[in-house]
């Protein structure tokens, strides 16, 4: 695959991994490694059987889809690996790449970890960072055939580069590689965030490492952004590749160190104290994304913020290791996340649990003496990868928002797919999660799009409805979404009907946030019908400091964004002036 004809110095370096427990390599370049990249890349010879794009439509799976296996490489941090294995083996197989399986088994037994649901591949390796060098789960025709897609790894570590060939062969899954021109592409799993519907996020590292020079003064690969987009569309089915500016203090420029898709509509994003570390660039990137992109259904992305914790001394990058809570892995119904210190961990765990109801959240301390994984530049997501199931039953749903409708049923549409076809689907709903759910049958309403439709009966004003969707394939396989259902669910609330005066008041039915503000700030605007007007902000003298929006306010909810990082501290007024009147809300800028 990737290591033939290598220089002698590189071969000697890589062979350490199999001969003995390897010296720990960081997630970034180790001293001297960058100098090896030129000769390493020039000498690469692919051993993968498939280096051309799939001929059938391809879709890259999201992390919340069903996994058959979690992947790790056993080296360097056995105490952390034990905890990952103990949590993941309850959800799926754990495939352990290792030098000696007997050593691994003895360690697990000695520390009380069952040897159940585990598979071992004895294979040479260079490092622990399997997220970056493993292949990605994709499906042909949405759900029909499982394949794996691998890229050129951006480190001169040939044994790591061969890991995808080892486990794809072990699982008997076809392996595609972007190894051969004109489809040669360098990429890394930490800089790859997928929604399962054709959208990918990345930092502009993807451009830097494929511009013909990169950091290595080499002429390979050499692609424009347009060509890169075409390669990921051909191999991954990605039709929207969103590339953000790199963060100045995240040395590896992997976005999994500060953000993560929680579902198709929701993005978890780290939050630094105002003006600190990568905070300003992170806020600017987020504002740019929200101003230019929507979720697959045209809704503004729902953003969940989680604090970026400091070091024990209170320092942030570049004066300390880059600690983050977003670097977790979703393994079917379990979230395995890094933690650091209780004073920050409690808030982060609460945010994850509230944002992903029903998921079991397992925490692993990555900042302990003797197990200080974060000091190496990555955490849990960085040292794990996954392989999807061979027969996914896929359910995709644009979940309902709060509504003023209390008289007509609530339509539930979902894409439900399986390679054997779908026998039936139902929506289950309740107004009290301590009580049983009621099933409502769904019918196939879009044969070409695999869309199924059902209805929840109308409910009185003030009711909160919890619901999930279940599908059954012709093969008999069943699946629910959200996957932890009925413990997990979507929810929406029935709001009251309003008069003109009340409708005007409801323009700001949700408060601006964060408030106080210093940086990216969201102004939610809501209306139960279309209104015309403008949204602007005044200072204490009444002077207009920014016009945010002029024109129509659509029915329902819209989010508008401002950046107050350069504003003078004080009290400002956000004004919504419509054809039905004026309403206002105070904003404090720190």
Residue ranges and their predicted role:
Residues 64-66, 88, 404-408, 419-421, ...:
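Solvent-exposed loop and beta-edge segments used for protein-protein assembly and interaction
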Residues 139-142, 197, 474, 577-581:
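Short strand-coil-strand connectors
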Residues 4, 17-19, 502-590:
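C-terminal outer-membrane/trafficking sorting elements
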Residues 387-498:
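Glycan-association/targeting regions that enable binding to alpha-glucans and other polysaccharides
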Residues 72, 304-306, 440-442, 492, ...:
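Generic detection of short hydrophobic beta-strand segments and adjacent strand-loop junctions
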